[in-house]
């Protein structure tokens, strides 16, 4: 029912919010302790609401696979941190772990809700969410020791993922879904042409 869909969407959004807030807790001790404690508590609050909604519905299976996704995300973030500390973070590893972080929650739903288009949805989710994050990371969250050429590599990778998504959507069976996905890509990545070249503003 529509109510169930809304509750599932709300639960997944709450999990993502909890992850985002916890990830923003600064390890820098110059940040006031109280501020960091409040951030942790805020993340715990959203995480608790996610459990509350699904437990009330008796959806233990959903709790289980979303919790598994959270574990995967946290492990990927730990991997990135360890690689960064040891100066072993390559572009390939960065993209690989970023893809896990960006897509684990939605992919857990795709594995739960099997459909004939499941493989296409899986590829589309991976491509678009990873591309979106890579473009965001180009704003300044990349390791300082990486050469400037890395920016070009990540930008090209993002464009490649976007173009792969466009080609994937072209073969979509449902024309309505195809139009909606094409619109989504154009709205989300307005400065990228079909050739993967940023348009002049």
What does each model-identified segment do?
Residues 1-201:
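All-alpha prenyltransferase/terpene-synthase fold signal
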């Amino acid at each position: 029912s529509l109510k169930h869909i809304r509750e599932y969407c709300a639960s997944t959004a709450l999990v993502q919010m909890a992850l985002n807030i916890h990830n923003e807790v600064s390890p820098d001790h110059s940040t006031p302790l109280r501020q960091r404690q409040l951030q942790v508590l805020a993340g715990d609050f959203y995480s608790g609401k996610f459990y509350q909604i699904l437990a009330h519905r008796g959806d233990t299976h959903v709790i289980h696979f979303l919790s598994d996704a959270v574990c995967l995300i946290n492990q990927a973030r730990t991997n990135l941190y360890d690689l960064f500390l040891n100066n072993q973070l390559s572009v390939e590893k960065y993209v690989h772990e970023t893809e896990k972080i960006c897509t684990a929650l939605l992919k857990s739903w795709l594995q739960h809700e099997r459909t004939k288009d499941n493989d296409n949805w899986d590829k589309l989710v991976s491509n678009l969410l990873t591309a979106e994050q890579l473009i965001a990371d180009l704003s300044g969250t990349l390791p300082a020791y990486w050469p400037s050429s890395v920016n070009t590599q990540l930008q090209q990778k993002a464009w490649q993922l976007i173009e792969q998504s466009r080609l994937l959507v072209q073969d979509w069976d449902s024309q309505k879904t195809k139009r909606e996905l094409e619109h989504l890509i154009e709205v989300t990545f307005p400065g990228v042409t079909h050739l993967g070249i940023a348009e002049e503003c």
